[in-house]
Structure formats: structure tokens, C-alpha cells
């Protein structure tokens, strides 16, 4: 079964308006495609590990990506790694350049989950920054 993997933005959730609207559209018009929207951690290495597991569980069946904002950045990294197809919605580009404002204690505005962002987490995003898109 084909899968659409929706990647929400930084500090967002599967309950975001775009994620819910996309899920509803697929339920109505493409019920033969599995819609998956995981809660992504705000840390690049953890997010990429989670997404890689989800993709590898589904291959060789088709996996398609939709990424919004930071999810677009992650989708770009996954396209590079797995050769998948993706739709990017206002993707973050070189996001490590703008994450300093998140240093310290934070809370997800939808789930209320608290988390701490450290300088090494910015470095993770820098390490994942793709240098070439095939």
C-alpha cells in the first residue's frame, strides 16, 4: 500500500490545521493511500531516526512525503537519502541559521510537551543540511 508521510513544522504537531486538512483530503479522495503524520521531536537526529524507521518499514512500497516548514527541510534530507518524491510547503532552508531564538526551555504550543534546546541541537540541523539535491 502506498504511504503519504506528512511532516509538520518545528514545534508543531499532527494536530496542526494543515496536517488535519491533508489527512481529511486523503481519507475522502485517496483512501487507498496510508496517511501517516508522526509527532516529530524538535531535534534533527531524533526526527530523522524516527522518519527513517517509518520509511524503511514501508519500503519497497511507495512512500511519498509532504513537508511543511521544518518538515520540508526534513523531507529534503529524506529525498536525498531514499530517492523519494516530496511536496514541500514553505520549506525551511539551512534552518540552523535561525534556531538560536529557541535555545533554552520551550513548550509545544499544541501538545504542551516541554523540551530544552541546546547549541548541540542547532549543530544537528547544520549536519543534516543537504549540499546537493539530486
Task: Enumerate the language-model features and the residues they cover.
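Gly/Ala-rich beta-loop-alpha elbow adjacent to hydrolase catalytic centers
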Residues: 65-75
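The alpha/beta-hydrolase serine catalytic core
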Residues: 84-134
Amino acid at each position: 500500500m502506498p504511504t503519504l508521510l506528512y511532516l509538520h513544522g518545528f514545534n508543531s504537531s499532527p494536530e496542526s490545521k494543515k496536517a488535519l486538512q491533508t489527512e481529511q483530503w486523503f481519507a475522502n479522495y485517496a483512501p487507498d493511500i496510508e496517511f501517516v503524520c508522526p509527532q516529530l521531536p524538535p531535534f534533527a537526529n531524533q526526527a530523522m531516526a524516527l522518519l527513517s524507521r517509518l520509511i524503511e518499514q514501508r519500503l519497497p512500497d511507495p512512500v511519498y512525503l509532504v513537508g511543511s516548514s521544518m518538515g520540508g527541510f526534513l523531507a529534503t534530507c529524506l529525498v536525498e537519502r531514499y530517492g523519494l518524491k516530496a511536496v514541500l510547503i514553505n520549506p525551511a532552508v539551512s534552518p540552523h541559521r535561525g534556531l538560536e531564538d529557541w535555545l533554552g526551555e520551550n513548550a509545544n504550543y499544541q501538545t504542551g510537551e516541554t523540551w530544552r534546546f541546546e547549541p548541540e541541537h542547532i549543530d544537528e540541523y547544520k549536519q543534516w543540511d543537504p549540499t546537493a539535491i539530486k
